[in-house]
C-alpha cells in the first residue's frame, strides 16, 4: 500500500513541501531563518489574538486596556511581553534572512525575492500600526510624525494624510482603523509567505557555494526538520529570556505615559528595527526628499538582482564583495545608532555620510566589485 502522505490531496502538498522535499546537502544555519520567521509569525498571531480579546481600540480606554491586560488578565503580562518582544525577534530574523539572501546571491530567484520584499514591506506596515495601539506618548507621536510624511506628496499629500487619519489629526478614527489593519495584515503576511514558499519550491533552495545542487540533494525530513527544531529552541530561549528578564529593554520609556497631543516628547523615534530607515529619512533636510530616500532605502532591494554583475552567484569565493558586504552591515548598524540619537552635530553629519555610503555601496561599489572579480578570474596568459 502506498503511503497516505503521498496520495492524500492535502497531505501530499505538506509532504512535497516539508517531508520529501529535495534539499541541498550543504545548506548552513543561515538557511534556518525562513522557518524561524514562520514560527515568529505563528507566535505573533496567537499572542495577538489573545491580546485582541481584551484590548479596546478607543482613545479613552486603549492605554488603560493594555494596563488591564498586564495587571488583571491571567498571564496577560506574559502575552504582552511575548508579543512586543516577538516583534523584535521577527525583525532580527528578517534582517538576517535578507542579509543571507544578499550574501549568497539568493536574489537571483527573482519571483521569490520580489515576494520577499513585499513581505518585508507588509511586516513593516504591520509593526508600525501595531506600535500605535497601546496609545502611549511614543505611539501617538510616532503615528503623527510618520503619517504626516504623506503630506509631502505633491498635490494630493494633505488630502491623503487626512484620509488615512479619518480627520484633521491622529485621533480616535485613526486608532480604530490601525487596529483593524493590525488584525488583518498578519493573515495577509501568512498568505504571502505561502506564495513565497511556492515560488521557492519551483526552483529549489540556493546553497552557500552558489553552484547548482541538483546532483546532491537530501530529503528535508529528517535532516532539516531536526536542524530547524534546534533553531526553534534557540529562538524560543532568546525570546523567553527577553520577555521574562528584561521585557522593556527594547521599548521606549515614553510609552509608559498616556498619549498627550499637547505635550511633545523631546526625542521622537520609532522602535529599533526602523531606526536605520528613520536615520536615512532625517539625513535629508527636505521633507519630500527624505520621504523618497526612506522609500528608496527599502525598495532598492527590488533592483538588487539587476545589479548582479559577477560571474559567480555567491559571495563565498569573492573576497572584495565580501568586504563590501560587511561594510554595508556595519553601515546599517551605524544608521540604527544614529536614528536613536538627537538631531545635532556630530550625529547629523555621520547620518548623512552613512546614508550616502548605503546607496553608494549597493548601486555603485558592489556591482563594480563584481566586474573587478570577473576580471581577476580571467586567465592572463
Curated annotation (Swiss-Prot):
UniProt topology in membrane: Multi-pass membrane protein
Single Gene Ontology MF annotation: ubiquinol-cytochrome-c reductase activity
Keyword RNA-binding: no
Highest taxon of source: Eukaryota
Names of required cofactors: heme b
UniProt xrefs under CDD domains: cytochrome_b_C, Cytochrome_b_N
Entry's transmembrane regions: 33-53, 77-98, 113-133, 178-198, 226-246, 288-308, 320-340, 347-367
PROSITE patterns referenced in this protein's UniProt entry, alphabetically: CYTB_CTER, CYTB_NTER
Binding-site residues for heme b b562, renumbered to this chain: 83, 182
Cofactor annotation comment: Binds 2 heme b groups non-covalently.
Chain sites annotated for binding heme b b566: 97, 196
Gene3D superfamilies attached to this UniProt entry: Cytochrome Bc1 Complex, Chain C (1.20.810.10)
Keywords annotated in UniProt: Electron transport, Heme, Iron, Membrane, Metal-binding, Mitochondrion, Mitochondrion inner membrane, Respiratory chain, Transmembrane, Transmembrane helix, Transport, Ubiquinone
Any Pfam family the entry gives: Cytochrom_B_C
Other notes: Heme 1 (or BL or b562) is low-potential and absorbs at about 562 nm, and heme 2 (or BH or b566) is high-potential and absorbs at about 566 nm.
Protein task: Component of the ubiquinol-cytochrome c reductase complex (complex III or cytochrome b-c1 complex) that is part of the mitochondrial respiratory chain. The b-c1 complex mediates electron transfer from ubiquinol to cytochrome c. Contributes to the generation of a proton gradient across the mitochondrial membrane that is then used for ATP synthesis.
Subunit note: The cytochrome bc1 complex contains 11 subunits: 3 respiratory subunits (MT-CYB, CYC1 and UQCRFS1), 2 core proteins (UQCRC1 and UQCRC2) and 6 low-molecular weight proteins (UQCRH/QCR6, UQCRB/QCR7, UQCRQ/QCR8, UQCR10/QCR9, UQCR11/QCR10 and a cleavage product of UQCRFS1). This cytochrome bc1 complex then forms a dimer.
Protein name: Cytochrome b
Organism (species): Dasyurus viverrinus
Amino acid at each position: 500500500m502506498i503511503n497516505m502522505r503521498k496520495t492524500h490531496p492535502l497531505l501530499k502538498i505538506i509532504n512535497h513541501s516539508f517531508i520529501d522535499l529535495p534539499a541541498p546537502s550543504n545548506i548552513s544555519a543561515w538557511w534556518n531563518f525562513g522557518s524561524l520567521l514562520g514560527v515568529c509569525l505563528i507566535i505573533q498571531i496567537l499572542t495577538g489574538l489573545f491580546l485582541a480579546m481584551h484590548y479596546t481600540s478607543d482613545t479613552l480606554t486603549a492605554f488603560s486596556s493594555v494596563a488591564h491586560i498586564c495587571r488583571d488578565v491571567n498571564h496577560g503580562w506574559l502575552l504582552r511581553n511575548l508579543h512586543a518582544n516577538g516583534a523584535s525577534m521577527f525583525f532580527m530574523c528578517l534582517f538576517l534572512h535578507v542579509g543571507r539572501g544578499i550574501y549568497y546571491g539568493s536574489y537571483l530567484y527573482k519571483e521569490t525575492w520580489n515576494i520577499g520584499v513585499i513581505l518585508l514591506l507588509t511586516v513593516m506596515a504591520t509593526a508600525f500600526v501595531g506600535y500605535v495601539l497601546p496609545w502611549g506618548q511614543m505611539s501617538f507621536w510616532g503615528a503623527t510624525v510618520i503619517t504626516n510624511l504623506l503630506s509631502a506628496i505633491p498635490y494630493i499629500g494633505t488630502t491623503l494624510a487626512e484620509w488615512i487619519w479619518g480627520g484633521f489629526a491622529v485621533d480616535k478614527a485613526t486608532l480604530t482603523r490601525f487596529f483593524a489593519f493590525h488584525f488583518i495584515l498578519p493573515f495577509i503576511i501568512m498568505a504571502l509567505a505561502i506564495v513565497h514558499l511556492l515560488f521557492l519550491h519551483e526552483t529549489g533552495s540556493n546553497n552557500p557555494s552558489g553552484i547548482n545542487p541538483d546532483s546532491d540533494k537530501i530529503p528535508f525530513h529528517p535532516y532539516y526538520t531536526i536542524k530547524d527544531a534546534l533553531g526553534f529552541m534557540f529562538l524560543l530561549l532568546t525570546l523567553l529570556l527577553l520577555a521574562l528578564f528584561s521585557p522593556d529593554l527594547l521599548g521606549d520609556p515614553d510609552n509608559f505615559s498616556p498619549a498627550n497631543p499637547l505635550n511633545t516628547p523631546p526625542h521622537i523615534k520609532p522602535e529599533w528595527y526602523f531606526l536605520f530607515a528613520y536615520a536615512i529619512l532625517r539625513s535629508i533636510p527636505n521633507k519630500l526628499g527624505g520621504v523618497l530616500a526612506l522609500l528608496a532605502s527599502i525598495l532598492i532591494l527590488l533592483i538588487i538582482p539587476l545589479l548582479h554583475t559577477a560571474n559567480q552567484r555567491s559571495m563565498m569565493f569573492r573576497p572584495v564583495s565580501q568586504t563590501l558586504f560587511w561594510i554595508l552591515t556595519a553601515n546599517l548598524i551605524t544608521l540604527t545608532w544614529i536614528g536613536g540619537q538627537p538631531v545635532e552635530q556630530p550625529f547629523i553629519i555621520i547620518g548623512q555620510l552613512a546614508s550616502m555610503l548605503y546607496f553608494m555601496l549597493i548601486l555603485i561599489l558592489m556591482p563594480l566589485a563584481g566586474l573587478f572579480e570577473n576580471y581577476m578570474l580571467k586567465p592572463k596568459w
